[in-house]
């Protein structure tokens, strides 16, 4: 049985948001804890949280979460792919497949993750109305390629140019594409959560 690891990307500056995104609260819980709980529920054994801006706050907030931390010292000047590389290095040898998510995509359905994990392929991602979402699943065999990729497009560019087996799953889960970059995005997330709860109670 393959070992499942997780990388949560939480190194960003949150420059367009007036608050620190990973620790913003939805339904009494921080965004990053929503993501951790989603991964734990999917059977992820080892989770690496990549920190940068406000490193100490995240580490204190997650002191009881049973996760590993990896620090991107150049977080203010690097793209997300560099944080991912740091997270993958910390996870090296602990996983055969890796679930990857930013810390600010907190409302993905657990069923969506189960459906993604049921698929094979070097790289698996959800598609919501033609838009690529999160989380994505990476086969550990792709890690050496990601470590040396120097082309455009970040993770997506690396995967799409590699010739690997790319598997896409059409989903009805809007939570896969609802991130949190601006105050308006956060209000949209809160409305989505409220509507989802109302529907589940019917």
Where are these regions (language model features)?
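Conserved alpha/beta core of the MobA/IspD/sugar-nucleotide pyrophosphorylase nucleotidyltransferase superfamily
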Residues: 2, 144, 150-202
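N-terminal glycine-rich phosphate-binding loop and ensuing alpha1 helix
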Residues: 2-51
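A short, conserved beta-strand element in the Rossmann-like catalytic core
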Residues: 14, 106-107
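Conserved N-terminal catalytic core of the sugar/cofactor nucleotidyltransferase
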Residues: 33-97
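Short beta->alpha linker loops
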Residues: 53-54, 75, 79, 111, ...
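Conserved donor-nucleotide/metal-binding helix-loop-beta segment in metal-dependent transferases, i.e.
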Residues: 108-131
């Amino acid at each position: 049985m393959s070992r499942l690891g997780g990388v949560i990307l939480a190194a960003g500056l949150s420059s367009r948001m007036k608050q620190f995104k990973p620790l913003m609260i939805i339904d009494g819980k921080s965004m990053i804890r929503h993501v951790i709980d989603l991964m734990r529920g999917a059977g992820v054994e080892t989770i690496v949280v990549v920190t940068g801006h406000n490193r100490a706050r995240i580490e204190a907030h997650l002191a009881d979460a049973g996760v590993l931390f990896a620090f991107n010292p150049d977080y203010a000047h690097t793209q997300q792919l560099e944080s991912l590389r740091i997270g993958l290095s910390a996870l090296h040898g602990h996983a055969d497949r890796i679930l990857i998510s930013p810390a600010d995509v907190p409302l993905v359905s657990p069923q969506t993750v189960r459906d993604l994990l049921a698929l094979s392929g070097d790289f698996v991602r959800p598609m919501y109305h033609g838009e690529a979402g999160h989380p994505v699943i990476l086969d550990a065999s792709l890690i050496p390629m990601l470590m040396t990729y120097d082309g455009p497009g970040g993770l997506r560019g690396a995967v799409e140019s590699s010739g690997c087996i790319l598997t896409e799953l059409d989903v009805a889960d809007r939570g896969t594409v609802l991130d949190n970059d601006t105050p308006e995005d956060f209000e949209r997330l809160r409305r989505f959560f409220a509507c989802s709860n109302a529907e589940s109670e019917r």
